[in-house]
Design a protein with these regions (language model features):
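Nucleotide 5′-phosphate-binding alpha/beta core
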Residues: 1-109, 114-148, 202, 429-504
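Active-site phosphate/ATP/adenylate-binding loop shared across adenylate-forming ligases
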Residues: 2-23, 81-300
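Structured loops at beta-to-helix junctions and adjacent beta-edge loops in soluble globular domains
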Residues: 154, 211, 237, 277-279, ...
Length: 504
């Protein structure tokens, strides 16, 4: 790609008005965005079929003639790619556009949370797309075009993708909005606290980016004076979180309504920034948390998934048999890539209709009362992967349900929200759920009754998982979790240098 194209794209970013862009997105019919995503899919396929050695070979082995793929319906007949049948079968170089490293502006790594780490070269144009997506979200939620802002990136962990992309994007946002600055203490509690103590007072607001367990730990340790005097906004990514978690964080930072204070970005190493929460999606999730009927109507089950909106210029997402399949532009393009994540798609019209049917009110009227202006970009929801959960007597227990149990007021003063769980068997082959919990800083293992904690955690877990609640009422103490306690920062389970692994 010519340098001129990068300069033009950057000029477009710096001269754009995200508030006007968001207003246009609220007026444009949703079909415009779906059509745009389909066009992205076809364009990305054509580039890959012509220039990516691995994908050419993949099509040949699957007896697929790329010349016959002309419409989106043709596109949907293409074989799915995956880590096993595509990424792991070819050298990294052969997976790249042109089969070479030309114009690959940065390379980062996955966290290895689902296996060995992989490396992801990307074009600078991908990052510019992230800049635009974050700009739209930051203006919608945080009014960064009107307030001086300090960006605190506490997600940096060396070569891993999320922290790297956020760090670069935050710096470009600070370049665009002049009365802003960016600092990157990384996933380091002391450095983050020192940064806030030294700098926060000079800005109208502070946006802190990080992983949910770190952010929860941070707000628990935040000095009351900083929490009281600072307008804190939170961006969480890297893993899903519940509305109970959002409400807990809101309470700790003094926010009554979290629609415009706490949001998440949904991303992955292979897909980059997939989507963002806007105020509308936060509101919908907050209502769904209190209405099982709405949750089931929207998502087909009573578990509340992540819900974001995605930009159609860089990706196309499909629901194939209840799993998300993604086509993504980039230095390492992916065509109909099976993410292995359970989830689905919704249009704004779908959501408004089901909201009216279940809640009995007009969604836009309710949003207007909260000062929220919706946009019409497509929604994607994500439950996560079954292999990221533990099983107990035939039911599935997700990390999100355990996280909710651990932030209960009854035990929160003893525990952080970090844990590791697994299904274990005793000598008689009885199945048990084992949860290794991290104690708060300064709390000693011998000062806490693990058995009492097990009882409280099981009661809280029953509140968030109806299946576990039924199991507990039937089997009583036989399904109480086995609780193992570790001191704060235990190197085996809770190293601050790595992304938390919830499944052992």
């Amino acid at each position: 790609m010519e340098t001129k194209e990068y300069i033009e794209a950057l000029n477009a970013f710096f001269s754009s008005n995200a508030r006007e862009t968001n207003a246009m997105a609220s007026k444009a019919p949703s079909k415009v965005f779906f059509d745009m995503a389909e066009q992205t899919a076809l364009e990305t396929f054509r580039v890959a079929a012509k220039t990516v050695p691995a994908y050419k070979d993949f099509l040949r082995k699957n007896k697929t003639d790329p010349e016959k793929i002309k419409t989106i319906e043709d596109f949907k007949t293409l074989p799915l790619t995956s880590k096993d049948n595509y990424l792991s079968k070819y050298p990294l170089r052969d997976l790249l556009v042109g089969g070479n490293w030309e114009d690959r502006f940065a390379t980062t790594s996955s966290s290895g949370s689902s296996g060995n780490p992989r490396y992801w070269p990307r074009f600078f144009m991908q990052d510019i797309g992230v800049f635009n997506g974050m700009d739209a979200t930051y203006v919608d939620l945080f009014d960064i075009d009107r307030k001086s802002t300090l960006f605190v990136n506490s997600a940096g962990m060396g070569v891993w993708t999320a922290g790297d992309m956020v760090d670069i994007a935050d710096k470009f946002m600070a370049m665009k909005y002049k009365n802003h600055s960016s600092i990157s203490p990384g996933i380091d509690m002391d450095n983050t606290l020192w940064s806030l103590n030294a700098l926060a007072a000079d800005f109208e607001q502070v946006i802190i980016c990080g992983y949910p367990p770190f952010l929860k730990d941070l707000v628990d340790q935040l000095p009351k004076e900083i929490a009281k005097k600072t307008d804190i906004k939170i961006i969480a990514f890297g893993e899903p979180f519940s509305e109970s978690w959002r409400n807990y964080i809101a309470k700790r930072i003094g926010v009554k309504k979290p629609y415009k204070s706490i949001c998440s970005f949904l991303g992955s190493s292979e897909g980059g920034l997939i989507g963002s929460e806007f105020a509308t999606s936060v509101y919908i999730r907050q209502v769904a948390q209190t209405s099982r009927k709405l949750t089931e109507s929207l998502f087909g089950q009573n578990q509340l998934p992540s819900l974001v909106q995605y930009g159609p210029k860089s990706k196309y997402i499909e629901d194939v048999g209840g799993q998300l399949v993604m086509t993504n532009k980039g230095g390492l393009p992916l065509i109909r890539y099976d993410t292995k994540d359970a989830g689905g798609l919704l249009s704004p019209e779908d959501i408004a209709s089901k909201y009216q049917e279940v809640i009995g009110r007009n969604l836009n009227d309710d949003l207007a009362k909260e000062g929220i202006v919706p946009n019409n970009m497509p929604y994607v929801y994500l439950f996560g992967r079954a292999d990221y959960s533990a099983t107990l007597y035939g039911i599935t227990i997700s990390p999100e349900q355990v996280k909710d149990a651990l932030i209960s007021d009854r035990i929160n003063k003893l525990l952080t929200s970090r844990f590791n769980m697994r299904t274990v068997y005793d000598k008689s082959e009885n199945q048990n759920l084992e949860i290794v919990c991290e104690l708060r800083r300064g709390v000693q293992v011998d000062s806490v009754d693990a058995q009492s904690l097990a009882g409280i955690i099981s009661e809280e877990l029953a509140h968030f998982s109806t299946e576990y609640g039924k199991l507990l009422s039937t089997m009583k103490g036989r399904v109480l979790p086995i609780i193992k306690l570790k001191e704060y920062g235990d190197k085996q389970y809770f190293s601050s240098k790595n992304k938390q692994k919830y499944l052992g």
